[in-house]
Amino acid sequence: MDLSLSTRTVGDRTVVEVGGEIDVYTAPKLREQLVELVNDGSFHLVVDMEGVDFLDSTGLGVLVGGLKRVRAHEGSLRLVCNQERILKIFRITGLTKVFPIHTSVEEAVAATD
């Protein structure tokens, strides 16, 4: 399966809608998108993972890398996810303590840092 990405601006946040599989083959596409956004001055990102069907360790690494990039600019990276199979990966790896995870884009956009 492939990876789909789209971006939109909501207030001062950039929302990245992700769909499909984030794995060793598709993660570089997500990494490029996050790097490009940060390089263009978007330091407050919301990654909407509601359309993600699969996530592996490569995908987790890309998200952690994105978080480091935005934090270097006093920014934030928030996730939106309600899917138990994806949330389980974040719990098992302890990344629920690293990433703020929200139930909706609206909630993530409204959250303050």
From Swiss-Prot:
Residues 3-112 form the STAS domain. Phosphorylated by RsbW on a serine residue. It holds the Pfam family STAS. Gene3D superfamilies: STAS domain. It comes from the Bacteria. The modification Phosphoserine is found at S57. Signal peptide: none annotated. GO terms for molecular function: anti-sigma factor antagonist activity; identical protein binding. Belongs to the anti-sigma-factor antagonist family. PANTHER family: ANTI-SIGMA FACTOR ANTAGONIST TM_1081-RELATED, ANTI-SIGMA FACTOR ANTAGONIST TM_1081-RELATED-RELATED. This is Anti-sigma-B factor antagonist. The lineage of its organism: Bacteria, Bacillati, Actinomycetota, Actinomycetes, Kitasatosporales. The gene is rsbV.
